[in-house]
Amino acid sequence: MGPAEAGFGDYVALLKPRVMSLVVFTAFVGLWIAPQPVNPFVAFCAVLFIALGGGASGALNMWYDADIDAVMRRTAGRPVPSGRVTSQEPLAVGIALSGLSVMMLGAGGNWFAAGFLAFTIFFYAVVYTIWLKRSTPQNIVIGGAAGAFPPMIGWALPTGGIGIESLLMFALIFFWTPPHFWALALFMKDDYSKAGVPMLTVTHGRKVTRCHIFAYTLVLAPFALWLGFTSVGGPLYLAVSVVLNALFIAGGWQILRRSEDQAQADGYRVEKRYFRLSLYYTFLHFLALLVQHWVGGW
């Protein structure tokens, strides 16, 4: 099959729209709750350019990871390994969107935020995808910074800089990322092993991974709660964060106490439930920040 069989949806899929949706949302929240007001049209354009930058990162990742995507069940249906899109098209799309998104964000917003976006694209495409992902079990720990930068970019658009609030938003996503992906790796270990990706489950086993998941839930909680006591926090956000972190820690504790025999016996039911919870964890925190901004904080 050649590229002629590719549809519009295949090119959209190159941008990893599900991943991009969280990037867009967290960037928007960072922008909207910043202390300086921003014109709604400028905000819309800025978020669009950040989305294009996120899509560029996804396309470059699809280009470089085509070989391992073809091996893993979870990714074998993607446009490149399935043959619907040629291997070089994601590279062209990624480079074009990288340049466009950074230049437009700089021209329409500010060059500090644009430089931040350029660094984020570079970090995800080069530092994480090309270097870390295949070389160290800490791949998702260090590489997770790429997914944590968007709210800082959003914050930098109206403010032109960095604040404690944007650093804590970064920390929330940064420390959430490892347990989120390690939970997935607990029940997808064979896929990662077959593809030669040194996830923690592959290099150190599931027992060590369970310990790391629980440890990160404990590290994550203080940063999430601390955000509630800053200028963007308030009682509503804090209440949501307390509940979410209690559930996340309880889920991590359940995972820690499980034996591999128990997990295999019930098809990794607890691990899959924890993974689903992690999908909502970050979204609900940022939604709570947005609602708190509308109703007023402390």
UniProtKB/Swiss-Prot annotation:
Its main location: membrane. The chain crosses the membrane at residues 19-39, 40-60, 91-111, 112-132, 140-160, 167-187, 213-233, 236-256, 277-297. GO terms for biological process: heme O biosynthetic process. Pathway: Porphyrin-containing compound metabolism; heme O biosynthesis; heme O from protoheme: step 1/1. It catalyses: heme b + (2E,6E)-farnesyl diphosphate + H2O = Fe(II)-heme o + diphosphate. Keywords: Cell inner membrane, Cell membrane, Heme biosynthesis, Membrane, Transferase, Transmembrane, Transmembrane helix. One of its GO terms (cellular component) is plasma membrane. It comes from the Bacteria. The keyword Kinase does not apply. It is found in: Cell inner membrane. One of its GO terms (molecular function) is protoheme IX farnesyltransferase activity. The keyword 4Fe-4S does not apply. InterPro entries: Protohaem_IX_farnesylTrfase, UbiA_prenyltransferase, UbiA_prenylTrfase_CS, UbiA_sf. It is a multi-pass membrane protein. Its EC number is 2.5.1.141. PANTHER family: 4-HYDROXYBENZOATE SOLANESYLTRANSFERASE, PROTOHEME IX FARNESYLTRANSFERASE, MITOCHONDRIAL. Carbon 2 of the heme B porphyrin ring is defined according to the Fischer nomenclature. Interacts with CtaA. Belongs to the UbiA prenyltransferase family. Protoheme IX farnesyltransferase subfamily. HAMAP family: CyoE_CtaB. Converts heme B (protoheme IX) to heme O by substitution of the vinyl group on carbon 2 of heme B porphyrin ring with a hydroxyethyl farnesyl side group. This is Protoheme IX farnesyltransferase.
